[in-house]
């Protein structure tokens, strides 16, 4: 059964989470000097914004993308600024996805392409290849839909001049 755009993005974010986990965990553990860095990050948020601590998970792509964008200097050995900007774009995409936004084919294709690029940047080739397959499937579906719309038979009526009428 064909996937819809939301399902494609959901699968891609699952693959992104897997692909980013090791790098983000390593860098953030080094920065916070503890493997429980999400707790430290949450404590900083609570202090900075004057609110209750929130439970953050290492495996949440929102937390991983936020780590890359907000602690960019810590990732500078692993990711260039351009590659880090992919994470910034994906934060917006992830927020739209989390809030139930609809994704057209162009937006979906861009999101899948950006996820694939970020996965390649962190050398998560298997996940990147899986995302590429999702994008290729989307492209195939779009092409088939457009071809089907163009080739639908149209009803035409032939009109011929009646005898006896002058042109």
Predicted regions and their residues:
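Amphipathic alpha-helical interface elements
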Residues: 1-167
């Amino acid at each position: 059964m064909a996937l819809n755009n939301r399902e494609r993005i959901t699968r891609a974010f699952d693959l992104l989470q897997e692909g980013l986990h090791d790098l983000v965990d390593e860098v953030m553990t080094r920065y916070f000097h503890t493997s429980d860095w999400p707790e430290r990050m949450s404590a900083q948020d609570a202090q900075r914004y004057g609110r209750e601590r929130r439970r953050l998970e290492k495996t949440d792509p929102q937390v991983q993308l936020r780590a890359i964008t907000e602690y960019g200097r810590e990732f500078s050995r692993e990711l260039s600024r351009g590659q880090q900007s992919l994470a910034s774009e994906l934060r917006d995409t992830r927020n739209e996805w989390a809030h139930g936004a609809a994704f057209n084919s162009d937006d979906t294709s861009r999101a899948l392409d950006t996820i694939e690029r970020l996965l390649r940047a962190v050398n998560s080739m298997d996940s990147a290849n899986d995302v590429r397959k999702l994008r290729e499937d989307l492209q195939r579906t779009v092409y088939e839909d457009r071809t089907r719309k163009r080739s639908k038979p149209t009803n035409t009526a032939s009109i011929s001049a009646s005898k006896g009428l002058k042109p």
